[in-house]
Amino acid sequence: MIQLDTSWLQHVQKPARYTGGEYNSIVKDHSTVDVTMALAFPDVYEVAMSHLGIKILYGLVNRREDAAAERVFAPWHDMEEEMRKRNIPLFSLETRTPIKDFDVLAFTLQYEMSFTNILNMLDLAGIPMYAKDRDMDFPLLVCGGPCAFNVEPIADFFDIVSLGESEEWGDEFIDLYKAEKAKGFPGGKEAFLRKVAQIPGTYCPALYDVEYTEQGDFKSITPRFEDVPAAVEKRIVEDVENVFYPTKPVVPFLDIVHDRAVLELFRGCTRGCRFCQAGMLYRPVREKTPERLLQIAKDTIANTGYNEISLMSLSSADYSKLPELVDMLMEEFKDKQVSVSLPSLRIDSFSIDIAKKVQQVRKSGLTFAPEAGTQRMRDVINKGVSEEDLLAACTNAFKSGWNTVKLYFMMGLPTETDEDLAGIADLAYKVLDLHRDITGKRNGSVTVSVSFFVPKTHSPYQWYGQQDVEEIHRKQRYLKSLINNRNISYHYHDGYTGYMEAAFARGDRRLSKVLVKAWEAGCKFDGWTEYFNYETWLKAFADCGLNPAYFARRTRDFDEPLPWDHLDCTVSKAFLKREWEQAVEANLTSDCRRGPCKGCNVCPELNTAIIDYKEGGRVEKVTFGLK
């Protein structure tokens, strides 16, 4: 066990990030289990502890008597300095065991700009970065999460990639690891990886060869062995009603980003917003019943003492039994001062009655996501809402006592013009004027938050070249010039960070050396604006003979091989191509939950179907797929 001396620990910011011992944390004797796993999140404690996936994995592994899971997060700059000064290796929170002593080190890949933190954590742990330099005496490096669907830029560092939902995969992997460990891993690491690759949803990068053309373009990724799959299909959990859910999560000692109980209403989203990678990755929609959700809420509140429950899914307002669920939750917790919160709401799903109910305990502002300022642009991205929808929702809200509205938009979308940007300002002014007309007061406020669009893999925009940073900055200045009212706040994201994010989102295996160069030059916590250094990143690319524009800004041909083609989210490329063509024509594609199947291919490929309780019972739809 690593000993932490309070004589120096008290001088770092928020020592509770590193002490462990939180309520509901689980401590096991490593000598009594067969498999030890460090669950890593490459960001600071407050961000990591807010992530539902970590909570699920922590409970999932620790419910087994033969396995132990502990947490490890990226130490903040001051703590890292102290650790390096005192030669303290990266350690787990539960038992302060050096990370290099675990059997498995499993990272959650949530955001491309956290990749340098992975390298920094490996260095602090004394673990070689490149998978080729590690034998079975080191922890096996495993990763999963949305970025795993193009893991190629960091594939050289990882041994195993879990694609899709991990509950069932995790048990299968631990069972195999336990059995092979007991036999002494006959045949060594490569033999073990070949066995792991037989688990559905598993990608082992070292078992594949990457080929490039003479011009330096990506050509192919092919397996080195006949028993290794050419493409890896994602895993899903069909029975979300009965799947494990963490009702006894660790309660942190300090405030975290999302410090509340979390209810996952359903998985997947079929709205089909064309900019949204998650909506494609996590199909099909699978709902939990209100009764199951109520029991989860009761157990979680009893086990944690939280006073807020957040209803979380990709589009929570689309939960088919939302009014019934809210009534059940409010009735259960009305005398316990436990509030219920909804994230940003789709305008067309908004019900003022629901909003009024969930804010009986604590009232806050309302958040909507029109995403674009004109109807043409909203149709291009398949948002499926109108200006009338937004103004109607705001009318109901203002009549019911709300004064504050936050609106989310994106900038840099395909086919976007200055007229579309002006529409953002117009909408903000219309909402503000609406508040004054309804209330007769001038105390209304509108927050306009605009992010820089980053094209992502496995979406209809995966072929689209990102707009130039200078053009984005011009657009940001232009929109700012149109907003001249102290009651309208305008926030926007840094364009340079989005540029690097796009490069790694659509990159290939050559980018691993860029990451190492950038890390060696001091890059880490790149998702934090105050620590992102654009010039250092440009130099890292140049030193490796690469250009970020090649990966981020280049529009790709439909028939061009893509570095992520072998990582199959089961939405067919034919469907994505059709959606791109529909976008160019500004044509809408309806939600298959409320209409006929659109042929995305997920349900027949996975032999599953949508699970929806809208009509009072379980609904499963027969579907087809575009090939």
What are these regions (language model features)?
Residues C276, R556-L626:
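Cysteine-cluster motifs in flexible loop/terminal segments that predominantly coordinate metals
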Residues A74-P223, P460-R509, V516-Y531:
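Glycine-rich beta-alpha loop elements in corrinoid/cobalamin-binding modules
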Residues L39-A40, M113, D299-K406, M410-T447, ...:
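Conserved SAM/AdoMet-binding glycine-rich loop
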Residues S7-A38, Y45-E46, P205, E211-V262, ...:
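N-terminal [4Fe-4S]-dependent radical SAM core
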Residues F192-C204, L314-Y319, P343-F350, G412, ...:
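A glycine-rich phosphate-binding loop feature that marks nucleotide/adenosyl-phosphate handling sites
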Residues M1-P15, R64, P604:
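Helix-enriched interaction subdomains in cytosolic or periplasmic regions
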Residues H51, D255-E291, G599-G616:
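Canonical Radical SAM [4Fe-4S] cluster-binding loop centered on the CxxxCxxC motif
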Residues M37-D43, Y58-V61, V250-F275, I301, ...:
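N-terminal pre-triad scaffold of radical SAM enzymes
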